[in-house]
From Swiss-Prot:
Gene name per UniProt: NPIPA7
Region (Disordered): 151-171
Superkingdom classification of source: Eukaryota
Pfam family, one: NPIP
Protein's recorded name: Nuclear pore complex-interacting protein family member A7
UniProt organism field: Homo sapiens
InterPro entries in the cross-refs: NPIP, NPIP_N
Similarity comment: Belongs to the NPIP family.
PANTHER family: NUCLEAR PORE COMPLEX INTERACTING PROTEIN (PTHR15438), NUCLEAR PORE COMPLEX-INTERACTING PROTEIN FAMILY MEMBER A2-RELATED (PTHR15438:SF5)
Length: 369
């Protein structure tokens, strides 16, 4: 071929019948049968094409099988794959299941959000309608104000419930405390009653006689009329010791003349002076306990007492609240004979010399001890 080209170049590019003959003869001599190069080349090309088709078919079938395996995974664990591949498949399957669960959760949340948004849109539409209606009537409110009012009402209701519950708890605690104090007071009252009963049983029978009360009434009347303090030793026990020796009764009679009352005390009913005892703190001469006192201060405007200087024991003038109906001739009258004395009563008091005073609810203190 190159020879032909060189021959053409050497010949100056002119083609003649001679040159064509030379080429044809060379071709016939070198390549018998065809111009392509002969049968060996055809055989090689044919074999190569057949092998290429086979390789292409093998590759295509392998790819198809791989694709089918990917689409339809085998349920059999012993499919000839290695452990690494099986673990990878399992992890992929779990991952796919996890992705599916996550997608379901996402869709659920999306539905919830969509529901809330739709409800809010519906509320906004209703609020818009209400606002349009109220705008005509001169009113206007928004969804925020409505929600704020609802929240305030809920808070107020919750606060009221809390206050009621707290008040109930405080009331229960107060009632419990009151019940405790009542129990303590009742126990103290019971102890006081027991103590009173115990000491009342220890009092001597002579102190429980009516004479003791009469003597105490006389002492109270003496204290009220004279202004001296009341001495608790004027009891039956002290009077018993003092009544043993008495001076003779005085002959002088004291007559008290007042604008509204005139008293004439008989000689047998005069209160005799008592001798001093061991527990007497008064420094009184034994000849007479009823002695005139020094002149006192000027009486006030509301003082109706007219106290003579010669004697302190005298009846008071009747007051506005005095309901006693006492005969004016004598307030100190002898008492009727008392009960016979008991075995432990050593008082020897004649019945005509016991001081009897009129009963007055504001001037008499009866001791029950």
């Amino acid at each position: 071929m190159f020879c032909c080209l060189g021959y053409e170049w050497l010949s100056g590019g002119c083609t003649t019948w001679h040159s064509a003959w030379v080429i044809n003869t060379l071709a016939d001599h070198r390549h018998r049968g065809t111009d392509f190069g002969g049968s060996p080349w055809l055989l090689i090309i044919t074999v190569f094409l057949r092998s290429y088709k086979f390789a292409i078919s093998l590759c295509t079938s392998y790819l198809c099988v791989s694709f089918l395996k990917t689409i339809f995974p085998s349920q059999n664990g012993h499919d000839g794959s290695t452990d690494v591949q099986q673990r990878a498949r399992r992890s992929n399957r779990r991952r796919q299941e996890g992705i599916k669960i996550v997608l379901e959760d996402i869709f659920t949340l999306w539905r919830q959000v969509e529901t809330k948004v739709r409800a809010k849109i519906r509320k906004m539409k209703v609020t818009t309608k209400v606002n349009r209606h109220d705008k005509i009537n001169g009113k206007r409110k928004t969804a925020k104000e409505h929600l704020r009012k609802l929240s305030m009402k809920e808070r107020e209701h919750r606060e009221e419930e809390r206050q009621v519950s707290e008040a109930e708890e405080n009331g229960k605690l107060d009632m419990k405390e009151i019940h405790t104090y009542m129990e303590m007071f009742q126990r103290a009252q019971a102890l006081r009653r027991r103590a009173e009963d115990y000491y009342r049983c220890k009092i001597t029978p002579s102190a429980r006689k009516p004479l003791c009360n009469r003597v105490r009434m006389a002492a109270v009347e003496h204290r009220h009329s004279s202004g001296l303090p009341y001495w608790p030793y004027l009891t039956a026990e002290t009077l018993k010791n003092r009544m043993g020796h008495q001076p003779p009764p005085p002959t002088q009679q004291h007559s008290i003349i007042d604008n509204s009352l005139s008293l004439k005390t008989p000689s047998e009913c005069v209160l005799y002076p008592l001798p001093p005892s061991a527990d007497d703190n008064l420094k009184t001469p034994p000849e007479c306990l009823l002695t005139p006192l020094p002149p006192s201060a000027l009486p006030s405007a509301d003082d109706n007492l007219k106290t003579p200087a010669e004697c302190l024991l005298y009846p008071l003038p009747p007051s506005a609240d005095d309901n006693l109906k006492t005969p004016p001739e004598c307030l100190l009258t002898p008492l009727p004979p008392s009960a016979p004395p008991s075995a432990d009563d050593n008082l020897k008091t004649p019945p005509e010399c016991v001081c009897s005073l009129p009963f007055h609810p504001q001037r008499m203190i009866i001791s029950r001890n």
